[in-house]
From Swiss-Prot:
<dbReference type="InterPro" id="IPR014729">
    <property type="entry name" value="Rossmann-like_a/b/a_fold"/>
</dbReference>
<keyword id="KW-0067">ATP-binding</keyword>
<keyword id="KW-0436">Ligase</keyword>
<dbReference type="InterPro" id="IPR022310">
    <property type="entry name" value="NAD/GMP_synthase"/>
</dbReference>
<feature type="domain" description="GMPS ATP-PPase">
    <location>
        <begin position="200"/>
        <end position="389"/>
    </location>
</feature>
<dbReference type="InterPro" id="IPR029062">
    <property type="entry name" value="Class_I_gatase-like"/>
</dbReference>
<dbReference type="InterPro" id="IPR022955">
    <property type="entry name" value="GMP_synthase"/>
</dbReference>
<dbReference type="InterPro" id="IPR017926">
    <property type="entry name" value="GATASE"/>
</dbReference>
<dbReference type="GO" id="GO:0005524">
    <property type="term" value="F:ATP binding"/>
</dbReference>
<feature type="binding site">
    <location>
        <begin position="227"/>
        <end position="233"/>
    </location>
    <ligand>
        <name>ATP</name>
    </ligand>
</feature>
<dbReference type="Pfam" id="PF00958">
    <property type="entry name" value="GMP_synt_C"/>
</dbReference>
<feature type="domain" description="Glutamine amidotransferase type-1">
    <location>
        <begin position="9"/>
        <end position="199"/>
    </location>
</feature>
<feature type="active site">
    <location>
        <position position="175"/>
    </location>
</feature>
<keyword id="KW-0547">Nucleotide-binding</keyword>
<dbReference type="GO" id="GO:0003921">
    <property type="term" value="F:GMP synthase activity"/>
</dbReference>
<comment type="subunit">
    <text>Homodimer.</text>
</comment>
<comment type="function">
    <text>Catalyzes the synthesis of GMP from XMP.</text>
</comment>
């Protein structure tokens, strides 16, 4: 097993681009481990990471802004390959004596580029390509020792390179899928320029994480916030493999679970994996706290707090418990805000924790994306029934019932969601659709059922396709399948007379409604 410092890795420096997490994700697709770090990292800290290559992300600043994000300039002298993307290319240009100016017109969207001087970055790629641009400044004079490698109609210097020092810059965003050959360019950087072997796998990851968990925990005990979803289930099996019965799983039935979920969780994880699970019936406790609350952020905070307090109560019955495990993912951390990104919404695993929490946190999945977690689950020998379960938020149905939560509303969402999952399975679409669920938007509308007028609830069906959860598109479910879903919901679920389908992508929307 390799030590982390010996592992091939490409570090992405975060200069505030909305796409920076995609760079990390793309690099991992090539079997090369990659992490996102703040631009404030020092050269000493960077050397300790021992990267094989570095990527400077894009960002919203101008390099001439007084408060523009900077990098430790000594990083350029480390003698390892660096790729500057958009703002990153402009930083590289000014550092080495080139010139950057404000563009007459901001360039945003698809653009045609021409590769004037092919190099290792463009090995095997066509000279004419469609890419995604998003910039307000541009390079007007390349630095000494660099060559202009790419041009476009509105950006005469769209790429630069110093092959001898393995320094490259591109004005466009290869990490965005609109850049047709962007993946291939990043792969060339990782494998051709940096010389990575591309042998990072979930087997490597699990070996490293198991060793880390054993080292951190020692002979202490760990509590896991087990929700029954993919993330907490995978982290539970991973930690159980590391420390066995030192792990106690606290499965809280807060009354916000999907239909039949509690029984399935106990049967699978306790029955098949012999995990130590304490089931806590806390339905009344949660519903009392949530009574009259309609604000989504307040609901998340209440649910998050009550979860921790329940764990605290259970932990007091056990000896030697020092750690709380969570299934926090990389996307959770990113969406909850970083030093250079605006908070979208507080996440149940990284927000809402009480200040007096008594446990130390263990989050072994917090560098993984959702598809990587599924791959890890398979590597750990978990059945598809768990690994490919629909993603389920920690607050459960509490954020799929918009507005105040009542038992009647919860039953509507449970029953409608069960029908949706049945019909998606019957249509053979389970693996094609990344996430699908129903939500209750707290909207009533007039309808006619039988010979009478109704004034009942509207159910929203949400289904999206995605690879990593950072971006998502609404799923093109066949009309006949949507019809079956709608007919069954209005006929089988009480107090529902209308079904609508959400056809909004992420962005601008998030996957969940709250």
């Amino acid at each position: 097993m390799k030590d982390f410092t010996e592992q091939e890795k490409i570090i992405v420096l975060d200069f505030g681009s909305q796409y920076n997490q995609l760079i990390t994700r793309r690099i991992r697709e090539f079997g090369v481990y990659s992490e996102l770090h703040p631009h404030t990292i020092t050269v000493e800290e960077m050397k300790a990471l021992n990267p094989t290559g570095i990527i400077f992300s894009g960002g919203p600043n101008s390099v001439y802004d007084e408060d523009a994000f900077r990098a430790d300039e000594r990083i350029f002298d480390m003698g390892i390959p660096i790729l500057g993307i958009c703002y990153g290319m402009q930083l590289m240009t000014t550092h080495f004596g080139g010139k950057v100016e404000r563009a007459k017109d901001r360039e945003y969207g698809k653009a045609d580029i021409h590769v004037e001087k092919p190099n290792r970055l463009f090995a095997g790629l066509p000279t004419d390509q469609v890419v995604w641009m998003s910039h307000g400044d541009l390079v007007v004079e390349e630095p000494a020792g660099f060559e202009v490698t790419i041009t476009s109609k509105s950006c005469p210097i769209a790429g630069i390179a110093d092959e001898e020092r393995s320094l490259y810059g591109v004005q466009f965003h290869p990490e965005v899928r609109h850049s047709v050959y962007g993946n291939e360019l990043l792969k060339n950087f990782a494998l051709n320029v940096c010389g990575c072997k591309g042998d990072w796998t979930m087997e490597n990851f699990s070996e490293v994480e198991i060793a880390k968990i054993q080292e951190i925990v020692g002979d202490k005990k760990v509590l896991l916030a087990l929700s029954g979803g993919v993330d907490s289930s995978v982290v539970g099996v991973l930690i159980h493999k590391a420390i066995g019965d030192q792990l106690t799983c606290i499965f809280v039935d807060h009354g916000l679970l999907r239909k039949g979920e509690a029984d399935q969780v106990m049967a699978t994880l306790q029955g098949e994996f012999n995990m130590n699970i304490i089931k806590v019936d806390a339905k009344k406790r949660f519903m009392d706290k949530l009574a009259g609350v309609s604000d989504p952020e307040q609901k998340r905070k209440i649910i998050g707090n009550e979860f921790i307090y329940v764990f605290d109560d259970e932990a007091n019955k056990l000896d030697g418990v020092e750690f709380l495990a969570q299934g926090t993912l990389y996307t959770d951390i990113i969406e909850s805000g970083t030093a250079t990104a605006q908070t979208i919404k507080s996440h149940h695993n990284v927000g809402g924790l009480p200040e007096d929490m008594q446990f130390k946190l263990i989050e072994p999945l917090n560098t993984l994306f959702k598809d990587e977690v599924r791959a890890l689950g398979t590597e750990l020998g978990m059945p598809d029934a768990i690994v490919w379960r629909q993603p389920f938020p920690g607050p459960g149905l509490g954020i799929r019932v918009l507005g105040e939560i009542t038992e009647e509303k919860l039953e509507i969402v449970r029953d409608s969601d069960y029908i949706l999952r049945e019909e998606i399975k019957n249509a053979g679409l389970e693996r094609e659709i990344w996430q699908y669920f129903t939500a209750l938007p707290n909207i009533r509308s007039v309808g006619v059922m039988g010979d009478g007028r109704t004034y009942d609830h509207t159910v929203v069906v949400r289904a999206v396709t995605s690879i990593d959860g950072m971006t998502a598109d609404w799923a093109r479910i066949p009309w006949d399948v949507l019809e079956k879903i709608s007919v069954r919901i209005v006929n089988e679920v009480d107090h529902v007379n209308r079904v609508v389908y959400d056809i909004t992508s992420k962005p601008p929307a998030t996957v969940e409604w709250e």
